[in-house]
A protein has these predicted regions:
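Extracellular/luminal Protease-associated
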Residues: 96-98, 146-246, 303, 401
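Bacterial signal peptide processing site
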Residues: 26-29
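Soluble metallo-hydrolase cores and metallopeptidase-like ectodomains found primarily
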Residues: 148-178, 235-305, 317-320, 324, ...
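His/Asp/Glu-rich mid-to-C-terminal helical/loop segments that flank catalytic regions of hydrolases
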Residues: 434-484
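Metal-dependent peptidase/peptidase-like ectodomains
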Residues: 300, 327, 337-440
């Protein structure tokens, strides 16, 4: 997920600013953007027919209704095991637009149908970028820059492996490369070296590509020659040449290089499509709708069993219970959103596809994103009846949840922006747990809530089973309360 509460909210804002060239995340050594905006790719929706030891025992039994249903489709752990298997068998991830993502979509649809829900897919288009190997920049003589420390790939870079002389563009000015005239006489087939500044990275890369550059290296340095490399983005696919950023010292070394320099980027950058899975259970009266959702994709770096397999599994367990029990008054609709990790593309596309009348029908939206963190701090966020229903249900099942800033870092934001009341449950990401929170929830102070956030170790061993069960039971009660 993109964290909906305090510490990572700044990182989310930085990531958004990075896409428009206004800022970045990670401190002075990892900023992105050049001071003016660049448009990102949109998303569309068209309806189609249908490693670190956890702080708490990950395998401990769930309580309440989840424990009573252990081993059945009403138990979240049943679905978590299946999601973990998909991640392990598909290059270690379930990312949108990949085989693991497709397998996740199909699993969710199958289990919802088994529970008696009407299911449909919705196609979503989004920009896809996957860096297969770290970047390589090799100077004459064989010295290589350190990937991550001296050189980084800009997201949506083109792929390639080139060796050519380096040509400094614009004499090292910060605005170098921003104007077409800066590229007059550029020797085709050489590697362009430009300094960061003034216009977006994508603007410099597009002009370099148009001038015939084999690759472009963007240098980030302050007045003393130190800084960087930036963690930046080109905003969307379209640049075909390798595009990397280096720190000031490395940039100076490239400018002095006598002979060919090698630049390699091994990545995939393209528009792709994936599917939301939307399921509905008709109510007994009226035309109001209560919604709940979770994102179905992981980051490419890991299988995402907590982020957000835990939310998906909790909702699938709820779908089974609700599908086999008495129908509520209001219609229930569950959404499993694709490409959340890339920028909320799935939920944004879904909300945009609703007419004004359809939006007014949606009474509430409940979001579940990361509800099984191994060093959990249980939080609710949202407003009105929706958060109140979740809070009451959680209060009845253990320590009262903490209140979190609503933020805009997960799929609830798409609904909130459309004027729909939202609420959600969250158990923490990479932020460290404070002493008071640790005492309240039995967590370890000073340790991350989820030490495997966005990492390859976000496996089944990284999930607190009892916490997922508690959340599933509480959300079931909350949704029943909202739906009547």
């Amino acid at each position: 997920m993109i964290r909906p509460s305090r510490p990572l909210l700044l990182a989310v804002l930085a990531a958004v600013l990075a896409a428009v060239g206004l800022g970045g995340c990670g401190g002075a050594a990892s900023r992105s953007g050049d001071g003016s905006g660049s448009a990102g790719a949109g998303a569309d929706a068209a309806t189609m027919s249908a490693g670190t030891a956890p702080a708490k025992p990950a395998g401990s039994a769930a309580g309440g209704a989840s424990q009573a249903r252990a081993g059945t489709a009403g138990d979240p752990w049943t679905h978590l095991r299946a999601l973990a298997t998909i991640g392990a068998g598909n290059r270690g991830n379930r990312a949108a637009g990949t085989p693991g993502g497709v397998a996740t979509e199909n699993l969710i649809a199958s289990r919802l149908r088994d529970a008696g829900w009407a299911v449909r897919f919705e196609r979503v288009s989004f920009p896809f970028f996957d860096e297969r190997r770290p970047p390589l920049v090799e100077l004459p003589g064989g010295r290589r820059l350190a990937a991550g420390g001296d050189v980084r790939t800009l997201s949506y870079s083109g792929a390639g492996d080139v060796r050519a002389p380096v040509k400094v563009v614009g004499g090292g000015r910060t605005d170098a490369g921003c104007r077409d005239g800066d590229w007059d006489g550029f020797p085709r087939g050489q590697i362009a070296l430009v300094r960061r500044g003034v216009c977006p990275f994508a603007a410099k890369a597009r002009r370099a590509q148009g001038a015939g550059a084999a690759a472009i290296v963007i240098e980030d340095r302050d007045a003393n020659g130190r800084r960087g490399p930036v963690s930046g983005t080109l905003g969307a696919p379209g640049i075909r040449i390798p595009t990397v950023a280096v720190d000031g010292e490395s940039g100076a070394g490239l400018a002095r290089a006598d002979g060919g320099v090698r630049v390699r980027v091994d990545a995939v950058s393209e528009q792709r499509a994936a599917r939301n899975v939307v399921a509905e259970l008709p109510g007994t009266a009226g035309d109001r709708v209560v919604m709940a959702g979770a994102h179905l994709d992981s980051v490419p770096a890991g299988p995402g069993v907590n982020d957000d397999g835990s939310g998906v599994a909790a909702l699938l367990a709820l779908a089974d219970r609700l599908g086999r029990g008495p129908r509520p008054r209001d219609t229930l609709r569950f959404g499993f959103w694709t490409a959340e990790e890339l920028g909320l593309y799935g939920s944004r596309a879904y909300v945009r596809s609703l007419s004004a009348a359809e939006r007014r029908r949606v009474r509430s939206y409940v979001n579940l994103d990361m509800v099984g963190s191994p060093n959990a701090v249980l939080e609710t966020y949202g407003s009105g009846d929706t958060e109140a229903a979740l809070r009451r249900a959680l209060d009845a099942r253990g320590p009262a949840p903490a209140a979190s800033s609503i933020g805009g870092a997960s799929d609830h934001a798409s609904f909130q922006r459309a004027g729909i009341e939202v609420g959600g449950v969250f158990t923490g990401a990479s932020e460290r747990v404070g002493a008071a929170e640790a005492k309240r929830f039995g967590a370890r102070a000073g340790q991350p809530a989820d030490p495997c956030y966005h990492r390859a170790c976000d496996t089944l061993a990284n999930v607190d089973r009892s916490m997922v069960g508690r959340v599933a039971d509480a959300v079931e009660a909350g949704v029943r309360s909202l739906a009547g």
